[in-house]
């Protein structure tokens, strides 16, 4: 897979499987539960095999599994575009290589309050990523903090597209919250050379228009 240009990784897991993987060393794990842990432990080989890709897209479940099963992630020297999906209840912000926030899991990245100020952002400073996509955005302050972290520490980042969650209720359903989020996005654009865009799909646009809402 050395010549692979683009990779989209989506591990399909259940809540029960995530719970098992989060506690792989517990004595009470039954044989079928141990099999789940062992199966996900092979993801290290997968990541090593795709480390030359230029475009990489990871779902929330995938990043949760990576953060729990991989002690380290290979350096993606050729990576230009990174797409990640945010999902409530998943540790998408627990992937240390991205410097993400400690939230749902017992591992944290260098944006976390657990990390000293001088060490924050260290894992991103040599990253060549120029474009970042975030999907499933819900308008929370945790997400906004993470977005600011990316803007500060990704040296090559030129474009960030943030897609609002389509189906589930988000904080953006409240007009006051939407106004604050838009103001913060505008401020991020002023302070950074990166073009930050908050985007909605056609489906969500039609849905909000029918409800008399405008972002």
Swiss-Prot record:
SMART domains: FBD (SM00579). It comes from the Eukaryota. InterPro entries: FBD, FBL60-like. It comes from Arabidopsis thaliana. Disulfide bonds: none annotated. This is FBD domain-containing protein At3g58975. Residues 122-199 form the FBD domain. The lineage of its organism: Eukaryota, Viridiplantae, Streptophyta, Embryophyta, Tracheophyta.
């Amino acid at each position: 897979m050395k010549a692979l240009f683009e990779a989209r990784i989506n591990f399909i897991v259940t809540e029960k499987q995530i719970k098992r993987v989060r506690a792989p060393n517990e004595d009470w794990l039954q044989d079928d539960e141990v099999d789940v842990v062992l199966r996900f432990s092979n993801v290290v080989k997968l990541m090593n095999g795709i480390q030359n890709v230029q475009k990489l897209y990871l779902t929330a479940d995938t990043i949760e599994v990576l953060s729990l099963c991989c002690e380290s992630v290979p350096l993606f020297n050729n990576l230009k575009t990174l797409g990640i999906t945010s999902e409530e209840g998943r540790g998408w912000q627990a992937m240390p290589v991205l410097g993400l926030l400690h939230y749902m899991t017992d591992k944290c990245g260098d944006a976390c309050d657990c990390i000293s100020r001088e060490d924050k952002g260290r894992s991103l400073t040599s990253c060549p990523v120029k474009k970042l996509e975030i999907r499933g955005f819900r308008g929370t302050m945790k997400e906004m903090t993470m977005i600011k972290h990316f803007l500060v520490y990704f040296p090559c980042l030129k474009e960030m597209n943030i897609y609002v969650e389509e189906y589930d209720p988000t904080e953006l359903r409240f007009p006051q919250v939407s106004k604050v989020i838009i103001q913060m996005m505008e401020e991020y654009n002023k302070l950074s050379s990166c073009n930050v865009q908050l985007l909605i799909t056609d489906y969500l646009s039609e849905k909000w228009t029918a409800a008399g809402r405008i972002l």
